[in-house]
Amino acid sequence: MRDKGDYLFTSESVSEGHPDKVADRISDTVLDAFLAADPYARVACETLVTTNRIVLAGETRGPSTITREYLAHLARLAVHDIGYEQEGFSWRDAKIDVLLHEQSVDIAVGVDAAGNKDEGAGDQGIMFGYACSETDALMPAPIYYAHLILRRMTELRKIGDARAAGLLPDAKSQVTLRYADGKPVGTTSIVVSTQHEDGMSQDEIKAMLRPLVTELLPDGWMCPDDQFYVNPTGKFVIGGPDGDCGLTGRKIIVDTYGGAAPHGGGAFSGKDPTKVDRSAAYMCRYLAKNVVAAGLATRCTIQVSYAIGVSHPLSVYVDMHGTERDVDHARLETVLRELVNLTPRGIREHLHLNRPIYVPTSAYGHFGREPDDRLGTFTWEKTDLAPALKAAFGR
């Protein structure tokens, strides 16, 4: 995204009932079950969901008390919470196959710490984090509002509110924002596709959703009515895993910054925090957000890279996109390394990641969320590093 000039930028989100998000939810449910039993459990759980079928596959290392029957039960509870009790996909009737097996010893030997050896990364890879001053959450505005629309629709649906009457779990949103001199000033178009009960008309759903969406946006930001597209094909009754097969890890741009920042390619859900695809991406977001919160820049991208079995990052890169305020990039890279231990273990300890905190991340974005000290969730969204960054640069 450009820092100056006039342009349009679009991001999309999907609801927790989208097939890929159902898969993400189940994978993170499995992960949390293992971490609740053993904070040092290893999990890489992939889920496939289709018409009345759920398949769990992958690798784990943890307590034998976590049985396949228990995991199947948890998968049903996850589907029930999302709200699927339909003929083609129901928490009651779906057949569940649990095909998880032990983690490879060849991977474990590179990750486990022994003697004085530091714990290595679980794989090679590159990870990115990003923050900007467009919203209070320090997130890009298009993805922020795309998430907000669907979260609100889901909240109302689950409590039986009339403002979401007849809506079903599967939904998508897409928000196009107009930028003037590099700053968001309003929407030019919004798309909302939502599964619904049979018999509801397109006009009825649009009339129900327009005030809901309008109240979530800043004053004057709502697009013209002819640019507010609701169920553009006219009907969306068959949805969820009965309409499309869902797989873990297929919504990585929705999960992060909506295309406003680079992505290293690794998905998050179902992976324990020894997998730097997840934990290092969380740390990069934490660092970038604190750079912006400290007032050192209004935009910040951070990249790190790792090799399997090697504890320290091979590289740390910072880009403030020309928005820095008397801050040298090389100096900032050094300061970040000094303030935070960027080994896999250091990341997990700093952000307290060895806990069952991942189910809430499985929909509506891993970033831009509110940290909850009681639940221990979204610790990477805290800005507690900002004072140290300010001090390091004499602010």
Curated annotation (Swiss-Prot):
Region Flexible loop, residue ranges: 103-113
Database matches in Pfam families: S-AdoMet_synt_C (PF02773), S-AdoMet_synt_M (PF02772), S-AdoMet_synt_N (PF00438)
Biological pathway: Amino-acid biosynthesis; S-adenosyl-L-methionine biosynthesis; S-adenosyl-L-methionine from L-methionine: step 1/1
Sites where the protein binds L-methionine: 59, 103, 244, 275
Chain residues that bind K(+): 46
Domain of life: Bacteria
Any one GO MF annotation of this record: methionine adenosyltransferase activity
SUPFAM superfamilies assigned to the protein according to its UniProt record, in alphabetical order: S-adenosylmethionine synthetase
Disulfide bonds: none
Cofactors demanded by this protein: Mg(2+); K(+)
Record-listed Mg(2+) binding positions: 20
Binding site for ATP: 18, 170-172, 235-236, 244, 250-251, 267, 271
Keywords: ATP-binding, Cytoplasm, Magnesium, Metal-binding, Nucleotide-binding, One-carbon metabolism, Potassium, Transferase
Assembly and interaction partners: Homotetramer; dimer of dimers.
Primary role: Catalyzes the formation of S-adenosylmethionine (AdoMet) from methionine and ATP. The overall synthetic reaction is composed of two sequential steps, AdoMet formation and the subsequent tripolyphosphate hydrolysis which occurs prior to release of AdoMet from the enzyme.
Protein name: S-adenosylmethionine synthase
Species, as recorded: Acidiphilium cryptum (strain JF-5)
